[in-house]
C-alpha cells in the first residue's frame, strides 16, 4: 500500500459474542498452562458433530467503527506520500503507527461489545467468594448492571440484552450455567466446578464496560 496506494484500505473491527464456548475443554486446558493442541480435520469433524448435538445459545456479531489506513498514516506522518516516494527505506514512524493501529482495532472491538444474559450472570456470581448468591441479591445485581449499561453506555455501538433479571436467571438455568439450590429462606443460585471457570471468559469480555462506574464507586467507598 505504501508504494502504490491505489485503493483505500479499511480495517473493520468485529465483536463476536457467544453464550457458550464450543471449545470449552481447550479453553480450560490453556488456562491450566497446557500447550495448545494442533487442530486436525478429524478433530474439526468431531467438534462439528458435537456442536450439532448441543445447544450453544445465540451468537451476536457487532461491527465496530472502521479504521482507514490513510487516516492512520496521515496522523503518524502528515507528509508520508512525499517521504516514501522513490525509496524503499523503512521510516521511524512506521513501527509506532502499526502499534497504534493494533491498539485502536482492539479499542473499537471493545466499543462494539454485546452484553448477553450469560455475561451479566457470570460477572455477578463470579464476584462472590463461593460463586453463589441469594436469588433476591442476584436479581438486584443484574438489574443494577443493566441499568448502568443503559444509563452510561461505553459507546454507541454497545448492545445489551433486553431480558429482565428474572428472565436472565431462567435462561442461565436453561443453558446449564446456573445451578439452583432450594432453601426455605430463599433459593441460592451458583456457578460450580468447571462451569464457573468457563464463565470467566464471559465475565472478562464485558468487564471493561463497567470500569468507569467501578472506579467512581470505589472512590465513594474509600
Where are these regions (language model features)?
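Membrane-interfacial terminal anchoring regions of lipid-handling membrane enzymes
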Residues: 1-222
